[in-house]
Amino acid sequence: MLLTEIDHIAIAVKDLEAAIAYYAEAFGAEVHHREIVESDGVEEALVKVADSYIQLTAATRPDSPIAKSIEKRGEGLHHVGYRVDNCQEALDAMIAAGATPIDKAPRPGSRGTTVAFIHPKGSFGTLIELVQENPGSGH
């Protein structure tokens, strides 16, 4: 099976600190990992709620994909991250099934992972991130 589980649900936010505080108060969420991803122009906080992970993501520059998403659609659901054993194989399978890739090849992601994004136009309106854990990466 190419997709093994949901890795995370990503929420685009304007104010990362306010979002972290809200999820902590409302759901008892704890920050599990925090990172600035310069290449994507974002700062993210991976919070754990029960057995699930929510990636709160804020723009660090106005030209980042998160800034553009918030400008166009407002804050809210950004993408679903699916865990895969092999990012390249999963990307190839999705393209063969008719998906439109944003990333033509897997690339480094946060937490030491390897990732590739699939455009919403080819996946029924949902931005998809394929997430491959590597040795030393993961939650």
Regions found by a protein language model. Name each.
Residues M1-I20, E75-V84, Q132-H139:
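N-terminal beta-strand motif that seeds the catalytic metal site of vicinal oxygen chelate
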Residues I6, V13, Y23, V47, ...:
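Short, structured motif recognition centered on aromatic/hydrophobic residues
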Residues E5-D7, A29-G41, T60-H78, A93, ...:
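A cross-kingdom feature marking solvent-exposed beta-strand/loop segments within repeated
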Residues L2, A45-L46, Q55, Y82, ...:
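Vicinal oxygen chelate
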Residues V37-Y53:
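C-terminal "cap" of GNAT-fold acetyltransferases
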Residues A19-A24, M94:
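Conserved active-site tyrosine of GNAT-family acetyltransferases
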Residues A19, A29-E30, I54-Q55, P62-P65, ...:
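Short loop/beta submotifs within extracellular cysteine-rich repeat domains
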